[in-house]
Amino acid sequence: MGFSFDWDDIFQYSTVKIVRIRDRRLGILHLSFLVGIVAYIVVYSAIIKKGYLFTEVPIGSVRTSLKGPNTFASNLTYCSNQQHNGSTYPFTPLECNYWDEQLALFPVGQDSTFTCTTRVRLSKQEANCNFTDPTCKFVDEPGSAKNIYIADIESFTILIDHTMYASSSGSQFNAVDLHGYILNQDGDEVQIDANGTSIGVSGKPDIMTIGQLLSFGGVSLDQASPVDSNVSIRYDGVVLFVFITYSNTYTYSTSDFKYVYSVQQIANTIYDVPETIILESIHSRLLYKRHGIRVIFIQTGTIGSFHFQTLLLTLVSGLGLLAVATTVVDQLAIRLLPQRKSYSSLKFQVTESMSNPMKKRITTDEGEDVLYTRIEGL
């Protein structure tokens, strides 16, 4: 039994064919798809979403400094050594000491972080043994340990000096050169410029009180600690994230830069750090176990610059929708409409072998096949 091959079938070539179907239903549907897709690509992707911008996250540095108030508050309810004018404190009050910024700030010299003390456990410790002995340990001198609060820490002011840099666009600014905002508890962007404090005012450094910083994060030092409801945050300490978000994409002018502070308390976290002061010998020391407000600055944001390749990619990625629209209309024409048989036979054509006269078979809507010969002249 022999096998015969038709080389024209084996090496057949499929090509694109354009058929103009005079059907208003298909035409209006396809035109609607095209208008919607062009509007999506040009208006939404390219213009509204700024698909012509190459964006990057800036880097930067943050420097902070602390300053005590000119006049301290008194009669504080959390101070056991002060008059309270009949007010009560919901937690156990402690003795209060008035410290300046040099004492209240610890640790010092850290990048992108800031810490100020709210409570200290002070103790004098002695090691009446030789450190060659593995059991040698420091112990508190009897009666030397005491807890104190740092009075009126909320009135201290913090200066925040930050700089941002975006490598691709070459943008570099200091906070003094920009206008900025801080988010309040309602999520609104606000500026501050009163009573010696300022936030986001171009030409002025950012200065706010510790109390303002806490309030923007929804934190009070006299609310319950997140890990022990029997003591306050003033007693245990707190850790805050301060996000500095830079942007030049909030308008259609990439020369307009701004930054926004947002303060977020880290849940279920307190802060303490030990400070050791050696006295007359290494066997004698003062131990300050500090609890306080730990602020961690995180610089982020979106800096954009015009980039032709990014615009081209935005346009090309949307053009794929045009092929989808054409496919949907084609399938509607050849599978769903009453004229689907005629439309299908017009869309798909299989020629006779090149060795035979060219013919074309078309199916009518009634299902009848009509054979055309010499189709080169059709």
UniProtKB/Swiss-Prot annotation:
Keywords: Ion channel, Ion transport, Ligand-gated ion channel, Membrane, Receptor, Transmembrane, Transmembrane helix, Transport, Vacuole. Residues 49-307 are lumenal. It is found in: Contractile vacuole membrane. The keyword Ion transport applies. Residues 1-27, 329-378 are cytoplasmic. One of its GO terms (molecular function) is intracellularly ATP-gated calcium channel activity. Pfam families: P2X_receptor. The chain crosses the membrane at residues 28-48, 308-328. Changing K67A: More than ten-fold decrease in ATP sensitivity. Residues 290-303 are annotated as: Pore-forming motif. Disruption phenotype: Response to extracellular ATP remains the same in p2xA null strains. p2xA null cells have been reported to have compromised contractile vacuoles and defective osmoregulation, and exhibit cell swelling. This is contradictory to other reports. Quintuple p2xA/p2xB/p2XC/p2xd/p2xE null cells exhibit a slight delay in their osmoregulatory response, but are ultimately still capable of regulating their cell volume in water. Extracellular purinergic response to ATP persists in the quintuple null cells with no alteration in the kinetics of the response, but the magnitude of the response is lower. One of its GO terms (biological process) is calcium ion transmembrane transport. Changing D330A: Loss of function. Belongs to the P2X receptor family. This is P2X receptor A. The gene is p2xA.
